[in-house]
Amino acid sequence: MGKLIRMGTQERRLLRPKRLHWSRLLFLLGMLIIGSTYQHLRRPQNPPSMWTKVSSQQPIKLAVRDLPNNEMAVAGSDPPEASSEVEDGMLAAQDTVIMDEAAPSIAMEDTPNPPRTTKIPPASLKNSYSPTTAGTRRQKENIPPTPSGAPSHFISTPGRQRVKSYIPKPRGERKNSSPTHAREKGRTHTPSPAGAHTISPTATVRDRETMATYRLLETRFERTAGETTAASLKRMVLNTPTFLTHEVETNLMTSSSLVGKNTAVSLRKGERNISTTPQGAVPQHTPATSEEQMTVSTRMGSIPATIEGSTAARRINNPLSRTSAPAIRIASATNREKRPSTAPSTLVTPKATMSTQVHRCVVVEPAPAVPMTPSPGVTSILFPETPSSGPSALPPGWPNLHPKAEYPPDLFSVEDRRQGWVVLHIFGMMYVFVALAIVCDEYFVPALGVITHKLQISEDVAGATFMAAGGSAPELFTSLIGVFISHSNVGIGTIVGSAVFNILFVIGTCALFSREILNLTWWPLFRDVSFYILDLSMLIVFFLDSFIAWWESLLLLLAYALYVFTMKWNKQIELWVKEQLSRRPVAKVMALGDLSKPSEDAVEENEQQDSKKLKLPSVLTRGSSSASLHNSIIRNTIYHLMLHSLDPLGEARPSKDKQESLNQEARVLSQTKAESSPDEDEPAELPAVTVTPAPAPDAKGDQEDDPGCQEDVDEAERRGEMTGEEGEKETETEGKKDEQEGETEAERKEDEQEEETEAEGKEQEGETEAEGKEDEQEGETEAEGKKDEQEGETEAEGKEEQEGETEAEGKEDEQEGETEAEGKEEQEGETEAESKEVEQERETEAEGKDKHEGQGETQPDDTEVKDGEGETEANAEDQCEATQGEKGADGGGESDGGDSEEEEDEEDEEEEEEEDEEEEEEENEEPLSLEWPDSRQKQAIYLFLLPIVFPLWLTIPDVRRQESRKFFVITFLGSIIWIAMFSYLMVWWAHQVGETIGISEEIMGLTILAAGTSIPDLITSVIVARKGLGDMAVSSSVGSNIFDITVGLPVPWLLFSLINALQPVPVSSNGLFCAIVLLFLMLLFVIFSIASCKWRMNKILGFTMFLLYFVFLVISVMLEDRIISCPVSV
């Protein structure tokens, strides 16, 4: 059907090429219209309005540093340092007035009150001063030193801000005092009106002349928008919609002040009343300060100002790398006239408009003092200055603090989003999840498959490298965006949340939705979990100092290289481990199922099979070592699932075509285990702890129907074998053989009961006895004969396949009994087995039976037992064949009845296998089709996915088409570009949603983004688990986490360090470290619980893990919001 549909699709495409060309033009035209509309809507948007609303309760704070020693105009005194105030990610503006005999403290606050009044409280001497805080929220800050002044050292503390206070010493030396936390209570600023921000003035008084210089640099910080300021080209002051707040501390009473104004600035002129003060006393913003406060309230508006002379004393320099605002310097001087608070002045009209944006931090840098000529007027000059930028301003040992996330402006303000428009962002974020899954499954993973084929990479290594990258590409790009664009820990949160989602949610869901108890293959899970525990331990140790150095990133990458190397030699390592486990007493579970297989011939056949594997898509087999869903043919893409399966969990198959392909795959798997080389499935067939799922026999439409019937067959065989064992003990004359056989059968029964898997236990015993008593080739032959019986084919057929007999099959019951007798007798003696093997190649089955009767055993009772056993097995086999016949399975049951020669059977089966594999390959490799579906529901889904699929179909060649296979490099690069775009949209809209709701990007990454990027794997894992292959889903979920931890995290960190001169990457977060520790504990719980349940997962354990995931989410969110404190301190 797939071929017909595909041919029909090609014909339809040939019939209507013009429509597709027109659709491409329409699509491009639509994109142009949308882009122009977006630009048009964005123009009238006024960012300051949003900023004023957001920051109405959060005034900006500026860090101020005073003049250096050589620029001081004060004799016998040191420059005081202003302590920075920390409030909501902004620095408080404080200034110091330096005088010959006294330093007046002037706190000027700009409020909308119409009258302008001056309040002069009496001077009071204080011995302690604590930085003021206006808010309860805290944020860490790192203020680099100024180039021209003495360096001051700031220590960055995760989760808590520290404010550095400086105590001046004689001779101009600066002392670094102990940090003061911003939690200390002090004077509280009156919150300024909407959009408050401050500039820091400095006034130096010389002989009744005041020299004040202002230089303001506005830099961006988190969650602020740009502001537009209007300024005069000649001598106009900054014009913004915000107010100015000035705080100056002094020990003198002042009657006049100098105010730098917003808009048309009103400059007030006054004369100082100087009181006596001990000479050399320097007031300062240090814990010991003599202070007096004077508050001047003015009203914003156009106020005339007299503009005379100018001077420059100070400037503000921005050390940050990303600044888009020029510094604004205001130089002013007071006059000598005694005037009230208000003074007549001339009107200044702004003639130029400058747009500035607020950054996180502003640092005042001292400028050379300029000799000033006394002037009776006040001069205010506004001129821009280009700030210095780049990481060179930072000390080499400290990382550069990131500015605000680099996202484009949103069409909707925060208020609009809170009124309901955030629904669009949520829908867009969910839609991008689907888009990422489609890009990865339909284009990126097939391109990686072509690359692995071109490079001749083995399946295990490809599954651990390229295919893991295909499945984890969204997490990798999210981590890159978090480091370089959003400047947050969203990437770490996404990867940690995705890891917990895969460990707990995916595995628990697989256990809940599987039809039977989920039996796990122990080696892939044990191997991957061991590496994962090692990687997580390294990550926890590296997180302890809240910085990731370049060599730590390199160590994580080397851990991934070690994992790839292990996957390269996976089979050899697996065999060595199981050899060590097999040296235990015989009474224990035999861990060495197929260790006798790898002979020289088997190795040669294995190499041939490896070359064959590179040409075919990997078949997802139970017990496979690679255990990757991304390189398996059962992995269904989201696009096909949504269009071809409306209820994937209900019927456990995407469609009728998929059902047929899966039934054919089940037959191929059973035939492959019997016919392929012994070493091909060697790691897959290690029965010691390799547990085969035992589904209910009445499960329909599932590829586990064959094992369901095998269960009945094997139970019947075991009952018959035990009865045969008793008969042998009574009648056989060879006592030693009887004793060995009885002990072996008893051990077999115990092992089977322990593992609750009759098929694997029987295979173990047969292989172990064959290993101990026969040569390696005979052990392979016998083991394969046993395996054939377990895969739903009768032992007669299996014996014929392995030993190449040409015999005419008689009655099925008698034939099975005789073949079972051969199988048992072969295991009872080396000489007997070898002679039987030589004669069986030439004789019919009857002659073989006569031969065994002449081997010295008492045959009558034994023959009766074996005949009865054969009847029991025949009944079970008849039922199994009937079930398979009803479901369309024609593997071993049909070939038992009518074929006359084994060679013809093998040829037919090989042809069927090749045809099935070709059909599966063609079906799996079917390119993306834009064919219009039939049903209404599928048409709606088709239209829903069309905005994603159509641009991809236009821009990326599909390598699943033979003619486009040569363009795999373009597909690879194009897929990466699309994944990066979709990941950027996902993180941006998640940031907008989090900003609207009020949660951080780290929490969004832990919860929403982690689940969204992992849902495609969840759907595939559940579907595969319902088909009886849940162990692959579990192993793949752990294996994909290794790629995230060892590649998704360190690659962006290493790139950041290389770009920024090997600086470490700050990764501190409130609850992220504790979340990683929780992930580690959850992993240990999952592994120990699974191991204690003998590598089986029932629904109760799955439900417990399901609940643990939500417990992890709640704890992580509470840790991130500091509702609870992390018991593990960093």
Curated annotation (Swiss-Prot):
Q: Where are the Alpha- repeats?
A: 461-501, 1010-1041
| Bias-annotated ranges (Basic and acidic residues) | 170-187, 730-751, 833-855
Q: Which residues lie on this side of the membrane: Extracellular?
A: 1-419, 486-489, 552, 960-966, 1024-1041, 1092-1099
Residues modified as Phosphoserine: S625
Region Disordered, annotated ranges: 104-209, 274-295, 598-619, 650-932
KW Phosphoprotein (keyword) present: yes
Q: Which Gene3D superfamilies match?
A: NCX, central ion-binding region
Q: What is this protein called?
A: Sodium/potassium/calcium exchanger 1
